Amino acid sequence: MIGRIYGTGSYVPNRIVDNNELSKYVDTNDTWIRERTGIARRHVIEEETTSFMAVQAAKKALLQSEVKPEEIDLILVATSSSETIFPCTACIVQSEIGAVHAVGYDINAACTGFVLAFQTAQAYIDARIYKTALVIGADSMTNLVDWTDRSTCILFGDGAGAVLLRAEEGKPCLMAAHSDGTKANALTGMSRHHKAVTSLEDKITYVHMDGQAVFKFAVRKVPEIIEELLADASLGVEEIDYFILHQANKRIIEAVAKRLRLDLTKFPMNLEEYANTSGASIPILLDEMKRNQRFQRGDKVVLAGFGAGLSWAACMFEW
């Protein structure tokens, strides 16, 4: 069984912060940011919350798929920036969209989260436990960054994306995933310390990243897991139509394409407009591509996420 994508949806805040505006707060400029990241602007929340964005993306996916909320069996939300530790964001989404028969829970795996959530939904569907699943990636990353830290504030934006999966007969989704907790300190967010014993001056609650370590990890491990995934099905990388990678950095995506000896046209990007939206980046891109009719039935599509943990995951399915 395969969970076929019947609908997609996305939401990004109206407020746009471009690179020129950022240069008012930190020592940077548009050229410097574009050359190193490929990012030109990012959408930033004002009154929105992570759950609000997730709900908007979910409603669009439902509308496109023509699936009724009460038909949904499972809601998974990949997020590392929910406004509450509990209840989970998925339960808020369930209530807001009226998915009265669905079970919902969150997956906290940062930028790898959406791929892991997608894999989880596919596994439930392949096991014939659930027939209809809503998988969402939503993050409010700009709440977590230090706007005086040039190494991180230029990278992130906010948004949400959703896909609606329905069970069909077909080849199951191929899946692979790994973690390396020994390198957890390379990319961290929030704090192990209670808010009462920290102060804004400590800055320990913000995102901290060893950019060089994360870059080296991504350009090595992402090609490896893609090749591992496809080898299990005796497929070559050249047989894949699209590689939808987490939209972290243009240089990372270019390096992955180069290591796989593939043309960059197989690696769609939208980070110029949205920056790194963490768990939301892949479903936002999927939604854009579907709305622009980029996919044809039978296309072989690889999703690959990578990030904090350190963690990395990939899956392949036919559209």
Range-by-range predicted roles:
Residues 5-7, 33, 61, 75, ...:
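Buried hydrophobic positions in well-ordered alpha/beta secondary-structure cores of metabolic enzymes
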Residues 1-47, 149-216, 220, 224, ...:
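Condensing-enzyme catalytic core mediating Claisen C-C bond formation in acyl metabolism
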Residues 202-271:
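A contiguous, well-structured pocket-lining segment that forms one wall/lid of small-molecule binding clefts
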Residues 126-160:
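Flexible, glycine-rich active-site loops centered on histidine and acidic residues
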Residues 11, 78-83, 109-112, 137-142, ...:
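Acidic, glycine-rich active-site loops and adjacent beta-strand->loop/helix elements
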Residues 5-7, 47-108, 229-230, 235-253, ...:
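Conserved beta-ketoacyl condensing-enzyme motif
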Residues 287-304, 316-319:
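Catalytic phosphate/nucleotide-handling subdomain of diverse soluble enzymes
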